[in-house]
Amino acid sequence: MQFKKTLVRLLLFLFPFSAAAQTTYLPLGDKANILIERLEIKSKNDSSLNYSKTRPFSRQNIVIAITQLNKRGVNDLKLSKVDQYNLRSLLMNNIEFGADKSIFRSKKTVGKKFYQTPANFYEVHIKDFDLVINPVIQAIISKESNNDQALYLNTRGLTLRGRIANKIGFHAYVTDNQEKDPLYVRDWVNRRKAVPGQGFYKPFKTTGYDYFDARGYFTFNATRYIDVTFGYDRNFIGNGYRSLFLGDGNSNNLFLKMNTRIWKFNYQNLFMELHSAEIPGGDKLLPKKYAAMHHLDVSVTKWLNIGLFEGVIFGRKDHFDFGYLNPIIFYRSIEQQNGSFDNSIVGLDAKANFDRKLQVYGQLSLDEFLLGEITKNRGYWGNKIGIQIGAKYIDAFGISNLDLQIEHNRVRPFTYSHRDSVANYTHYNQPLAHPLGANFKEFIGIARYQPAPKWLSVLKLIYYQQGRDSSARVFGNNIFLPNISPNRVGDYGYSIGSGWKTNVFYASFLLSYEWKENLFIELNAVYRKQDTKTPPLTSANTSVISFGVRWNVGRREFDY
């Protein structure tokens, strides 16, 4: 409660509501994200889309950028018919930010008031007020090879967004969900005491889970260059499929976000209220911890972007440390002033676009390290480092809308952990960055092909090797444990894969058909094989076939 009061007072003091036009944001799983990535690479010499590391994307900024790109013409960007279809769909799904709304009118409405455009169930666009309401439905049934029980995912709810007086934007997403997951996911839930990507949950019919997913936020522009968002949702920092700074696979959290975009700079400050690993039952208040992060993007050229990241996780007795509200100074100096070394992480990222077809990106995450120990190569436990490198190749081999992506992630043991378990880099029993935690190396390959406007196929291959902790010794995989004695035994001999070595191969194939706008019929197949290479040797193979529909909601995946 104290954290919420602090943020509200800060908003009122720093940013009086005399704002200009404002925005809402594309959901992280929105279909338009793929198109935005393609347009960014195709428009190599146009920097209007060159700030794609901090997500979700601003609807207003995307529409403005696309409008600017449209002035260059389809031939200049070499857009395929599928791209043009997706571009029209993006503008229709963000109709409140477009100049001409009449071009998207439905030929046939429902009861004259509903589906005035194909994208939205109900919408109002009048002076000083915009409102868009859509249902959210997902119904998926699955069959697992080594499981006699039927698997399913059932989601019902609604989503809405709007603007008031062209000064305040708002968004809400509320769903009720029941799911029964594959056996490897249930094992994950039993170990973590959390449902992937969700917060509080209840058992449902013995082996299922029941949870309520509610998100929402308010936005406004403090000045022409500063966007402010206050709400309860998720954020993502990076250009990869995964992130070593802040991923989107964890639970929603309360946050205040300030994004400053001017000249060649995009600077984001993010303050979050999180929950520690302890999840008591009943109606008890959950113990809280806090995070303060900032990320600076610099467009060195129109095709090269370099970023700096810094974040700190700190535990206080249910109150926010005001020192961390400073949006500029390095957090380590604040820790020293406070007499407390909290869990601080710094990072560097980069992204470069080449030849309108290729993007190369990467991240370097530094939790702690000693340069002398790195050169000695003795496996010092305190060298807590993560590295990501990847590439995207669009219209691969001259085939329109065939997009390939490869990515490699490696994180050393004990990265993201801390001597104080409250300050580990986690939220609601889930990692804040990469879903595997630490002590792993991972290889990802993704192929997306959209041969026609309504059809999409996605092949995904993931292989990772992880050194897991045993019952007798900790090897730096479990980032929830304090990284001090007796959990950590010794200072040396730790490398990626140390411990109970486990290899996992994951493959999935998705075939998706968009029957109506934002209504997808999908068939998905998953194969997963897990082998332990350290005695006692074990092996577990599973395959899952799924079929279902989803409407105005992103796909739910367990790809690890």
Kindly label every feature range from the protein language model.
Residues M1-T24:
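Bacterial Sec-dependent N-terminal signal peptides
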Residues S18, T229-R234, A507-F509:
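An exposure/low-complexity boundary signal
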Residues I36-L39, I226-D233, Y361, S365, ...:
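Active-site-adjacent bridging/hinge elements
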